[in-house]
Each structure stands twice: as structure tokens, then as C-alpha cells.
């Protein structure tokens, strides 16, 4: 099993969700996040004064899937989230040793 974490632009969330559903994923966890990378922050005007906004709004998507779906899920996220502009985001993949469904006690792939 693998855990895929994707940091994307908030307005791309619906497209990414639909792309993952087409791959066959049944559930995702979404968290609002703020951060910056190479794009750094940007300047905004507020009441006539310019402020530097260091952290930009992002969305973090987390999914845990079987190894057989990893490449398809990564490709779906990448295609749906890509705008071609700086700040499109990142995808991280890590190993998951175990998953347990609290309600039933199922474990492994049966739990996801």
C-alpha cells in the first residue's frame, strides 16, 4: 500500500477529485493548507498599503491505495492539477505498513 499526498491549487480540487474517481478511487481526505515553494509569496494591496503575502492557499489531498493503482492515480492528479504555471504543486508517495478500519477491524487492502 502507498500513501499519496498532493499539494495543489484550491481551484483544481474538483478536477482532481473527478480524475481520481475515474481511476476507481472511492475516498480521499482533503485539508486546507498554506505554503510556499519556488513561487514565494506575492504582494497584495490592503487599504492602500502593499503587503507581502508569504503563504499561499493550497489544498492537500491524501489517499491510501494498493500498489497496483499508484501510477494511474499519480498520472490522474498530475494531469488534472497541472496549469503549466509556477505553483501547480507537488505529489509525494510513501509506503504504508498497515491500514485498519476502526468500525470493523478489517486490515490491509480490505480496510481501504
From Swiss-Prot:
InterPro entries assigned to the protein according to its UniProt record, in alphabetical order: N-reg_PII, N-reg_PII-like_a/b, N-reg_PII/ATP_PRibTrfase_C, N-reg_PII_CS, N-reg_PII_urydylation_site
GO CC annotation terms, alphabetical: cytosol
Keyword Phosphoprotein: yes
Family affiliation: Belongs to the P(II) protein family.
Superkingdom, natural source: Bacteria
Pfam families, per database record: P-II
Entry keyword set: Nitrogen fixation, Nucleotide-binding, Phosphoprotein, Transcription, Transcription regulation
GO molecular function annotations of the record: ATP binding; enzyme regulator activity
Name the record gives this protein: Nitrogen regulatory protein P-II
Gene: glnB
Role: In nitrogen-limiting conditions, when the ratio of Gln to 2-ketoglutarate decreases, P-II is uridylylated to P-II-UMP. P-II-UMP allows the deadenylation of glutamine synthetase (GS), thus activating the enzyme. Conversely, in nitrogen excess P-II is deuridylated and promotes the adenylation of GS. P-II indirectly controls the transcription of the GS gene (glnA). P-II prevents NR-II-catalyzed conversion of NR-I to NR-I-phosphate, the transcriptional activator of glnA. When P-II is uridylylated to P-II-UMP, these events are reversed.
Subunit composition and interactions: Homotrimer.
Gene Ontology BP annotations: nitrogen fixation; regulation of nitrogen utilization
Modification O-UMP-tyrosine, positions: 51
Amino acid at each position: 500500500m502507498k500513501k499519496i499526498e498532493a499539494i495543489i491549487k484550491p481551484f483544481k480540487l474538483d478536477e482532481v477529485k473527478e480524475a481520481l474517481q475515474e481511476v476507481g478511487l472511492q475516498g480521499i481526505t482533503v485539508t486546507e493548507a498554506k505554503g510556499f515553494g519556488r513561487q514565494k509569496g506575492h504582494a497584495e494591496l490592503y487599504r492602500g498599503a502593499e503587503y507581502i503575502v508569504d503563504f499561499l492557499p493550497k489544498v492537500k489531498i491524501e489517499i491510501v491505495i494498493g500498489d497496483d493503482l499508484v501510477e494511474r492515480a499519480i498520472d490522474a492528479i498530475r494531469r488534472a492539477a497541472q496549469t503549466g504555471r509556477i505553483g501547480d504543486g507537488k505529489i509525494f508517495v510513501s509506503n504504508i505498513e498497515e491500514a485498519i478500519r476502526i468500525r470493523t477491524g478489517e486490515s490491509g487492502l480490505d480496510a481501504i
